[in-house]
Amino acid sequence: MEKIRTAVIGCGKVGHFHAYAYQHCENSQLVACLGRNMEKTEAFAAQYGIRAYTDLEKMVRETGVQAVSICTPHPDHGNIAVRCCELGLHIAVEKPLAASLEDCDAMIAAANEAGVTGTTICQRRFYRPAMRVKKAIDDGKLDKPILGTVNMLGWRDMAYYHSDPWRGTWKGEGGGVLINQAPHQLDLLLWYMGDIAELYGVWDTLNHPELEVDDTAAAIIRFKSGAIGNIVVSNSQNPALFGNVRVHGSNGASVGVQTDGGAMFIAGVSGIAEPPVNDLWTVHGEEDMLERYKAEDRAFFNSIDSIHYFHIRQLEDFLSAIIGKRKPLITFEDGRKTVELITGIYRSCRDDMPVKFPLAPENRGGFDGRLK
């Protein structure tokens, strides 16, 4: 089997997920990692038996790396990705794709110019219940989707925000719950419902007075299809409750996936304690399938390394796309759509009015909450 020479950029908590995944992808040979601090980077490299670098060009020259994962704080994604494209590297970027639409557009343009493959990490698309929802929609089992909802009601204490200096700031993170915890659910909503025509959104910091970013947000969406959407996300429920995405059809049928349970997953801190399952299934003639699907998904979850399995699946798809010269399941353009949705909510709240998509030029600047 052809193997792609891979490397990880960013040697923090999420970088370990990618390094482990690359070492367990059949089509990967992990060769290096890149960080800012050589001592920390060497310690990271020692865990995987790879070479440590602080200079990107030197790493490429000496290792012949072909594909990299970018696992740095969100505002750094754009500049790093553009330089990687210029060096001819294929790129997987941790969610969100970037902290601004400008960075997303620069990344997409650079990848197209260089002819390299890009993906953004949305590993929850590989959940079996999430794929089951998508297939039901594509197979017409809901007739026409007319309503899509996201509820992501989690908890992050201040110890979490203090664990890394970039967390909970506009400069270091580019936002709060919307841009850090909610992108997975927002990606699924867009995957299921399609492009947005217009939205009205609000956000606030309601339960973390030390933060300058959002810990709670909501939005009402009109999709281009004419369907309506609703988003409610928060990091203020203690204990955490759940995250789910649901789609309701014009024939009365409804399907849903619970992506997160009450034991919230924090990368590098906690494991995934509860399996993703279909939490709603009223497809006509299939109403009795819900409990069967739940049982199947729980059994599958208990049979895998749930912390790493879905990163492995997405990175295998990414590398297979490179080898097969095809698009990956999740593209940079998909990642941009999620960032545009998040940006639209921030802009709508700032201006206290609905915003139309695609966002107008004056609405595409990097957002700073102090402008509110």
What are the roles of these predicted feature ranges?
Residues R246, N251-L329, V355, A360-K372:
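C-terminal glycine/acidic-rich active-site capping loop/insertion
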Residues P183, H208, V232-A240:
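Glycine-rich phosphate/pyrophosphate-binding beta-alpha loops
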Residues M1-Y48:
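N-terminal Rossmann-like dinucleotide-binding module
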Residues H18, Y48-A110, F310:
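Beta-loop-alpha module in the N-terminal Rossmann-like domain of NAD(P)-dependent dehydrogenases
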Residues A106-R124, D143-G148:
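Rossmann-fold dehydrogenase core element
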Residues R124-L211, D352:
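Predominantly a Rossmann-like dinucleotide-binding segment in NAD(P)-dependent oxidoreductases
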Residues T54, V93, A99, G118-T120, ...:
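Hydrophobic residues in well-ordered beta-strands that form the structural core
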